[in-house]
Amino acid sequence: MRKYVIPNMRLGATSFLLHETYVPAVRFAAERCDDVALLLVEPGERNEYLATPGEIVEIGRIIAGERATLHVHLPTDADFDTWEGARSMIGKIRRVAELTGPLDPHSFVLHVDFPSLHGTGGEPSAEQQEWTAEALREIAACLPAPERLAV
């Protein structure tokens, strides 16, 4: 398959273009685009929805073979409303970072969320800001390079 070409731009796509498991979905995107977003947004309670180590190896082969780049979207199934939620998020992200590290993603995208503030127009409290800043420091420290964290 020939990649889509847009002059002076790199075309990107998510690993959810197909309703498929990780490997065929990444293959589909990498065959067509320059950059693939590996979406690992809901790992599950026991990481049962994450790609397996074998799938990660195959994803690495696909990305290299297609000369594509890759970035990872980190879990979103926890939040920063409470310190407990932030701690849960750190644990999930640490597991994803360990799993995907061999892929050498150029960035790890984190969506910082405060569900208690949805629709209120409110800002995070000073306490929420404090534990979020601490969580972000811990998250950045578990990545292959802290500057790869994109918030």
For the regions a language model picked out, list residue spans one by one.
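N-terminal pre-domain/capping segments
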Residues: 1-95
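Active-site acidic/histidine proton-transfer and metal-coordination neighborhood
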Residues: 64, 81-151
